[in-house]
Design a protein with these regions (language model features):
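Short beta-strand/loop motif that positions the catalytic acidic residue
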Residues: 211-213
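Alpha/beta-hydrolase fold nucleophile elbow
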Residues: 69-81
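Catalytic active-site module of serine/aspartate enzymes centered on a nucleophile-bearing elbow/loop
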Residues: 235, 239-276
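Short beta-strand element of the alpha/beta-hydrolase
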Residues: 1-7
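Active-site glycine-rich loops that stabilize anionic/oxyanionic intermediates
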Residues: 7-10, 81, 215-216
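Conserved alpha/beta-hydrolase
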Residues: 14, 19-43
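Alpha/beta-hydrolase-fold enzymes
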Residues: 87-174
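Alpha/beta-hydrolase active-site loop
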Residues: 49-68
Length: 276
């Protein structure tokens, strides 16, 4: 079984096509919407207090539900983008409950940048309110990703080379949007947690890890994904697979070569878990 953790500004329903392909190979998929995502009153906001801890607690609650219903089924945790950071935080806290880890469109962010962003978000939360939206924070967090694809057809060209997929994202009322000061404070705080000294060493060393993404993904790309893989390898994890896709952008499961990417993920899981 795969437990999917979606990215920032999207929702679990976007993984239906991936789930259908997995189901055809007898692999079940479970996904939930993170706080502040999907059909919620407070879109773009985790919580007024302890947002990151609550997000991780939600993942654990879903995992416990899976364990209660399917106690003998191994679970692979797949996190995309923001979900990959949540996934890492989860396995650092609850490593024994995971049979494999897949990190899609992730990165190993520079801590200096993270500290600056975290401080800015904390200050804005204190001065103007945690639920308020600040255009500077949102532009700093997401607005620059499209710059390398100029002249761009849309402001979301960085997501995929497939124009139909980009348009589908734009037309989805549950995608995009702006995010609160407190969410940015929580998210950058979570990133500081998972990139802290020896954090990767707290992940169970025998955990199989697949790190995948597009070489042109502005979030991590070749450099960020390679650095992330190196961090885990240097902390004693000897079952780390790095898969980079030439010309690929941020959402490899929605890219022009998505069928091949999906097949790679399924085959990796079957190899690690067994096809039965």
């Amino acid at each position: 079984m795969i437990q999917v953790l979606h990215g920032l500004g999207e929702h679990a329903g976007r993984y239906e096509r991936f789930a259908t392909a997995c189901n055809a190979e007898r692999i079940a998929v479970v996904a939930h919407n993170h706080r502040g995502h999907g059909h919620v009153e407070e879109f773009g906001h985790y919580a007024d207090h302890d947002g990151w801890a609550n997000v991780i607690a939600d993942v654990l609650q879903v995992r416990q539900h899976i364990a209660d219903r399917f106690p003998k089924v191994p679970v692979v945790l797949l996190g995309h983008s923001m979900g990959s950071y949540i996934a890492q935080s989860f396995v650092m806290r609850h490593g024994g409950n995971n049979h494999a880890l897949i990190l899609s469109a992730s990165t190993y962010a520079p801590r200096g940048q993270l500290r600056a962003g975290h401080l800015c978000a904390q200050l804005l939360t204190a001065l103007t309110g945690g639920q308020r939206v600040n255009s500077f924070l949102n532009h700093s967090g997401l607005g620059k990703f499209n710059e390398r694809f100029k002249p761009a057809r849309t402001k979301f060209d960085w997501l995929s080379r497939d124009e139909a997929e980009v348009d589908r994202y734009i037309q989805d009322p549950l995608c995009g949007g702006d995010f609160s000061n407190k969410l940015w404070a929580d998210l950058t705080g979570g990133l500081l947690e998972i990139t802290s000294r020896d954090a990767a060493a707290t992940v169970r060393q025998d955990l199989p890890i697949l790190i995948l993404g597009g070489e042109r993904d502005p979030v991590g790309g070749t450099i960020g994904l390679t650095l992330l893989a190196d961090v885990y390898r240097k902390t004693g994890h000897d079952d780390v697979t790095l898969k980079l896709y030439p010309e690929g952008r941020h959402e490899m499961l929605n890219e022009t070569n998505r069928d091949a990417v999906t097949r790679d993920v399924i085959e990796w899981i079957q190899n690690k878990m067994g096809s039965a």
